[in-house]
Structures are given as C-alpha cells and as structure tokens.
Amino acid sequence: MQGTFISFEGVDGVGKTTQVERLRAYVESQGRECVVTREPGGTALGVAIRKMLLHGVDTGDENDCADIAPRTEALLFAADRAQHVAEVILPALQRGAVVITDRYLDSSLAYQAGGRELTAAEIRNLSMWATNGLLPERTYLLDMDPAQSHARLQHAEDRMEAAGNDFQRRTRVAFLDLAEREPERFHVIDASQSIEDVWARIKADFDTVSTADGGIA
C-alpha cells in the first residue's frame, strides 16, 4: 500500500498540535498505521538541532546564548530535515503508513525566506536537496493573524516566537504566498474558527486525499 504524507503549517499558536492529534486518532481508528513527527526534532539528531534553533547556542553563561546567523539557521533546518526524511518519513511511507509532520520545508521557506529575508530560491533548493525532492501530498496551512495566535501561546517564548511582530507578519504573508503558488498541495484553513470547525474541514479534505492514495475509503 502506498503511504500518505501530510504536513501542517502556520505561525505559532494556530492550533497545529491539536489538529495533528485529531488526524492521528482518525487515521488509527480506520486501522491504518500513523506516524506523527515534527520539525525540527523528529530524530535524535533533530532534538539536538531543535534545542539550538529554538534557544540559541549555550555559551556557558546562563544569562547569555549566542545567536545563530540566518544562513547557519537555514543549514541547521536542512540538516534536521535530511535526517528526518531518511530516518523517519521515507521508511514509514514505504511501509504504507500515513505520515503527519508538524512543520516541513514550507516552514523554512516562510521563516527563513520570509521572516529572515533570505533568498527564497536558495532556501527551496537547499530543502529540496536535503529531502531528495520529497513533498507532502497535502499541506494544511492553519492561518490566523499572528497577534491573535500569539495570545494563545501558553509557554515561555522560544527564539522564533520572540522574534517580533513584524517577523511574524512577514512569515504569515510568506506562508500564504506559498499556498497561492501551489494550490494543488495546500489547503488553507481559517484557524480562528472553532477547533471542531477546523477539524471538520481537515477531515473532509483528508478523506479525498487518502482515498486517492488507496487508503481510507
């Protein structure tokens, strides 16, 4: 059986984790293997990279962390993604599983090329090389005004979340631009709706994607 590859994208606080878990439960209720993962941090190597990306580099001074240059940040994301595909995503797809990832290469394009203002073509080429061109069959972009989504956060801000309102707004615009360029892959959902309404839209769309792949009928 062919596997199904699904990604969830959006700025922080839009409710990706909640919907990922809903989709996991739905897939498993149909008797199909479901692998849920995330970027960065989907592998042991990724966990180490995630710590650097989200919290900076430990300098030995508890009051100071060395920041990461934008190009270095992009390379770290690509390294995490390459290992993630080789170790987790591709083997699961080859087994016929549904793979759901909380963030994938579109986050690099939105955060580095949009938020960090690096060159989009360079970021995309790097990500496609790292993944050997592997793209999700469907990407659910949960869209919300960053000011609204930021208010939902219930934990201390990490490095990305603390980057400022302008950064978050540029990132949201970059996500929407990506969706406009690839409408056959992206499904944009207004994340300011209720959890149930968001889930209903995801479920209805996922059923069409999975049926096309020979999965849930």
Swiss-Prot record:
Residues noted as binding ATP in the record, renumbered to the chain: 10-17
Pfam families in UniProt: Thymidylate_kin
Reaction catalysis annotation: dTMP + ATP = dTDP + ADP
One GO term of the biological process aspect: dTTP biosynthetic process
EC numbers: 2.7.4.9
Flavoprotein in keyword set: no
Keyword tags: ATP-binding, Kinase, Nucleotide biosynthesis, Nucleotide-binding, Transferase
UniProt cross-references to InterPro entries, sorted A to Z: P-loop_NTPase, Thymidylate_kin-like_dom, Thymidylate_kin_CS, Thymidylate_kinase
Source domain of life: Bacteria
GO CC, one annotated term: cytosol
GO molecular function, one term: dTMP kinase activity
Described purpose of this protein according to its UniProt entry: Phosphorylation of dTMP to form dTDP in both de novo and salvage pathways of dTTP synthesis.
Family of this protein: Belongs to the thymidylate kinase family.
Protein name: Thymidylate kinase
